Amino acid sequence: ANHFLPGEGFRQDPEELVRISQSLLEGLLASICPEGVDSPESGESSGPQIGGIGISAQMHGILYVDQNGKAVSPFYTWKNEWGNESYQAGKTYAQYLSEQTGMDLYAGYGSVTHFYLQKKGLIPQDAAAFVNIGDYLAMVLTNTFEALADVTIAASFGGFDLKKRQFALSAMETAGVDISYYPAVTEGKAVGTYQGVPVFTAVGDNQASFLGAVKDRERSVSVNVGTGSQVSVFSGELYETGKGEVRPFP
């Protein structure tokens, strides 16, 4: 699933990612419930019940969907570096947005990629919104069309107000970003069902790894020496020191 499409931009095929993910899900459900899934709504108890389907997704990246929830672009991953290209007055796209908004925005962040594509005229004409790949998987599984992003994913796009837990749309619009494509922010929402089982909005992979790795989040430190190379701790309050990155927790 790490295969990139030919050419620059570290882009992936969203339909292939969904196909692989759905195949893995089918195999998992079959191994847990060989005689069929008993959903919470079914009222039956002939076998194991599945309380819900959770999704964890790599953060920052975006893809565009049309009004019917169909992908109309590749998935531009967090590795995309177009935001580091020169924009104006000797500044890159990312530097310009950071200066204009007063927020830290980097190449690979969804808001920066979106701004680059907007200025280059590369947003598909039939695009209605952008979402993360995990959001798109949830849409496909539940056959829903509303563009939603869990707060953990939404914040990773950049241009996000941590105190309000919403996009800083006014600041982004003032900086010249077309804000009409931003998804609605939600928290822990079941967007629909798959085989009768609730499917929840995707959670950021960093937060999901912390949630799954520690027993006591209040007294634990998670050290990831893999791809992320991250040290993560939990805080019940918004605690900004300027020495690390604060991310919403589910």
Predicted regions located by residue number:
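Gly/Ser/Thr-rich active-site cleft segment
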Residues: L97-N206
